[in-house]
Each structure stands twice: as structure tokens, then as C-alpha cells.
Amino acid sequence: MKTKAEHSIIADAIHEWHTVYLPCIRNLSHNALKSYGEGMGIYIDFLESSKGVTSNTICGECFRKDWIEEWIAWLKEVRKCSPQTCNHRLSILKNFLRFLAHKKIQFIKYDCDAAEIKRMQQPKKQAEVITKDTIKRIFASIN
């Protein structure tokens, strides 16, 4: 029995994930689907530009933990993405890897490895403080 090439399995999984799983099972909105597609496309662009991987050579090893961590650094340094954007892109890739591992057990290692990658720290936003003087002016304007 002839087994399907890894690049074909991954390409089919990306297609099913984006056209069936996300819109029908997860019921994501059009904008969310667009974001997920862009996120996956950015990872594939990274593989092509930084690792020399093509659509015919993509394989499970392309989802190694160290490559994903390099990608996160690349997003931050080269693309100038904020920590929030980097975390969103990482969650998209993790979502795909979980889907891929459920479809083909041979990819479960990459799902487990990706799950260990920590999110970037995001700066906490300072709460805006309303001064007593401002509150007095607000109440004074009501009268």
C-alpha cells in the first residue's frame, strides 16, 4: 500500500482546517477565518524565506519547537509585531497543529512540542484615573 507524501498530508490538512473545520465546526466569522488564513500564510512565508521550505518539501519537521520559537522572534524583530499579535499568530499555529495531530497521529509530537511554547508577556495597560476635580466638574455640569 502506497502512503501519501507528508507534504500532501499537510496541504490537505491545511485546506480541510481552513475550509471545513474552522468555518463549520468552530463556526468562526469571516474576519476570524481571514485572520487564521493570514496567520498560517505568514508561517509558510517564514518557512520559505528563512528555511528554504517549499510547498513540495513541507513536512512535520517544519513544525519543530525551535523553528516555531524562531518564527515568533522573526515576527517580533522583522515584522515588528506586538506581543499581542505574536501570541495570536502562535495560537493560530497551535490550533492547526492540534487539528493535524487529530487527523494524523504521526504529527502528535509537533502538537505536544508547540503546546509547551509560552506566550509572550504583554505589557499591562494602566487604568486611567479620574481625579476628584474632574468628578466635581462632571457633577457640576449636570445641574
Model-derived segments and their meaning:
Residues 2-4, 15-31, 37-125, 141:
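N-terminal core-binding DNA-recognition domain of tyrosine recombinases/integrases
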Residues 7-13:
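A detector for short, charged/polar N-terminal pre-domain segments
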Residues 137-143:
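Basic, Lys/Arg- and aromatic-enriched nucleic-acid-binding interface segment
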